[in-house]
């Protein structure tokens, strides 16, 4: 998943994540997080934006302006939900599920609250309405 915020909020989002005591991954250069029994690999450099299609990047830019992105990889949906519940409250940005949806963070959190077992890899948010 990818968390996107306006570029001017980069330090705020990074601060929320760095408080969890990340450690460098000597192999990938990314950062690792071990929290609540889960393991995460994070790319805080924002390079994931280079992988966006032009229309996707336009959608993000039209919504939040120039974006900053954090890529988060983890082992399970439970891990993903836990991370997002820890990080997203109060974030004014977007969540890219990496499964064809980019949703406002507040809406994403609301959907997770109403549908605690939601697996966005298999079920689009429009099926939850």
Model regions: which residues?
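Acidic (Asp/Glu-rich) sequence patches and key acidic residues
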Residues: 1-129
